[in-house]
Design a protein with these regions (language model features):
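Alpha-helical recognition segments enriched in aromatics with Gly/Pro capping
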Residues: 1-146, 152-159
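Helix-loop elements that line ligand-binding/catalytic pockets
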Residues: 133-136, 140-198
Length: 200
């Protein structure tokens, strides 16, 4: 059902009236406040300019939020482009359920800081490509810790270490394909176990 305040079903709020409890400012349309999409466009313009390089957010914000930001920002700034690159991350789920405060199933970094290796935590978090969902569980963290331990046990200080090749780094240039990059690191580890210092 289309709101009586809309001329078209696709219209979105630019300015809305405020209740007594909400912040408000005077305007030609009466006392009110910016709509959700406008808040973000204004902050972006203030701190980043009419156009900027990278805009990010969760996958759930692609539509309508980011689409509406683009529409109003390009119109207001008379630009063809609002952001050069859009980076939308997948959700981290817990037992295949979206984390939500209302469900009481959220994890905080502070939950891990005293008993989890930060490198293992980072490795676990990048085990899925950033656009994809990641189901968090104890096994994922345990496997990541085992991998970090394994890599460190084979660590050798070399006078002239070899740089990681462009081929091995390539997945990072391919939309930050971290799972493929980690697979390449595993292959490099296996190669380094050959006993040949040239491969380390």
């Amino acid at each position: 059902e289309v709101s009586i305040n809309k001329k078209n079903a696709e219209d979105f709020v630019l300015w809305k009236p405020s209740s007594e409890e909400e912040p408000s400012w005077p305007s030609p349309w009466g006392k009110g406040r910016p709509g959700w999409h406008l808040e973000c466009s204004v902050m972006s313009k203030k701190y980043l300019g009419d156009k900027f390089d990278i805009h990010g957010g969760g996958r759930d914000l692609i539509f309508p939020h980011h689409e509406n930001e683009i529409a109003q920002s390009c119109c207001a700034n008379d630009t063809e482009v609002f952001s050069n690159y859009w980076v939308h991350n997948g959700f981290i789920t817990l037992s295949n359920e979206k984390m939500a405060k209302s469900q009481g199933n959220i994890l905080k970094i502070s939950d891990f800081k005293n008993n989890v290796n930060g490198q293992a935590l980072r490795l676990a978090l990048i085990s899925a490509q950033y656009r994809q969902p990641l189901d968090w569980n104890d096994k994922l963290l345990e496997e990541s810790q085992k991998t970090i331990d394994k890599w460190y046990k084979s660590y050798v200080v070399l006078d002239k270490p070899k740089l990681i090749s462009d081929d091995d780094l390539y997945p990072l240039y391919d939309d930050l394909n971290t799972p493929k990059y980690i697979a390449n690191l595993h292959k490099l580890y296996e190669k380094s176990q050959s006993g040949n210092l040239e491969d380390k």
